[in-house]
């Protein structure tokens, strides 16, 4: 299917690449379907990925695998909350992303470690949860960690 985006123009997205967030994403609860946009040639080493809404061209969130910034990232979430991803969750199918805030001065970029976005690539379901870890913040410095 063809998807209109503000930042990437018209892109082709196959149905099996659409991630459904039954509850939406915090702050964007009305939009349920997304896809990940990135440079496929750099897939293994890419740091910033875009979570693009299928039905809203202007809604694209920069996200990142948190281990690029915090190697020991381990969010604590209630297992009950993960049930919306499917009945048989396998660790190999799960990916965790965290939203980025990228201001004009990129050195002030932050990552939201408090509310990870969890995707099961077997069921293509996603959910954003609030981690119980008190050490994780909504705005954690990320630029200096990326540069290291």
Task: Please name every model-derived segment.
Residues 75:
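Residues that recognize and position ribonucleotide moieties
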Residues 1-72, 82-128, 134-139:
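A cross-family signal for N-terminal binding/gating loops and helix N-caps
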